Design a protein with these regions (language model features):
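Terminal transmembrane helical anchor/hairpin motif
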Residues: 35-43, 141-211
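Secretory targeting signals
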Residues: 32-69, 90-152
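Short helix-to-coil transition segments within interhelical loops
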Residues: 79-87
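Alpha-helical transmembrane segments
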Residues: 15-29, 57, 59-62, 95-104, 131, 155, 192-197, ...
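Aromatic- and glycine-rich beta-strand/loop motifs that create alpha-glucan
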Residues: 1-23, 137
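Hydrophobic alpha-helical transmembrane segments
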Residues: 17-22, 92, 120-121, 148-149, ...
């Protein structure tokens, strides 16, 4: 699996840097700009929470999308299903790699605001939902474009839903829940992630038969 991912991602060249630049250039610059406006630590805290919830979930599926594109749309992709039909383990490795990539950023954040570890845990669940959404729609529709659009539309809609306070749809919140409150908040998203991952596995299983 690791060897497959290596060769699949090697082909995208410089685009491999997009998640790194997003996490360690784009988001910190937005945070610095927010802090520079008034040197207010409370405003910086809110900006960190907002920016991470907007950009981290999208960046988390960057490698996933390219691996899916290779498995679904590349010529001769039927050879990839001879030994290992289920591609979820490869996608989960991409997911775990992103969580590790995210750790240094949150080590800095929690040095300033200790409770932001709860935001990291929240993002781990939300990013699993994004993985499930990308996986399910890609194998269901057999088109990476549709999968990308589904991810982008959900990301945009969740921010818009938060502005009108639609409960159960949006994870985009300024307040970071902790402990049992966070668990209750994340249960619907975790269940949705599980359903989509199962649906993705089913569509993935039948994908070679439909070619």
């Amino acid at each position: 699996n690791l060897k497959n991912i290596y060769w699949q991602l090697k082909g995208i060249g410089i685009f491999n840097l997009a998640p790194v630049l997003g996490l360690y250039v784009l988001i910190p610059l937005a945070n610095l700009a927010a802090y520079g406006m008034g040197h207010d630590m409370d405003y910086l805290y809110v900006n960190i929470v907002k920016q991470c919830q907007i950009f981290c979930p999208i960046l988390s599926v960057w490698y996933v999308i390219f691996v899916l594109e290779h498995c679904i749309e590349e010529p001769g992709n039927e050879l990839l299903y001879i030994r290992h039909r289920n591609k979820l383990p490869e996608l989960l490795l991409c997911y775990l790699a992103f969580q590790i990539l995210l750790l240094p950023l949150f080590a800095v954040y929690t040095g300033m605001f200790p409770d932001l570890w709860w935001l990291y845990l929240k993002l781990c669940v939300i990013q699993l939902l994004y993985l499930g959404l990308a996986y399910f729609t890609a194998f269901l529709c057999r088109k990476i474009t549709i999968s990308v659009l589904a991810v982008l539309c959900y990301s945009i809609s969740t921010v818009m839903a938060a502005t009108i306070e639609v409960q159960g749809i949006s994870y985009y919140k300024v307040i970071v829940n902790q402990g049992a409150d966070l668990v209750r908040e994340l249960i619907p998203f975790a269940l949705a992630a599980g359903v989509m991952l199962i649906g993705g596995c089913i569509c993935n299983y039948y994908f070679p038969m439909r070619k």
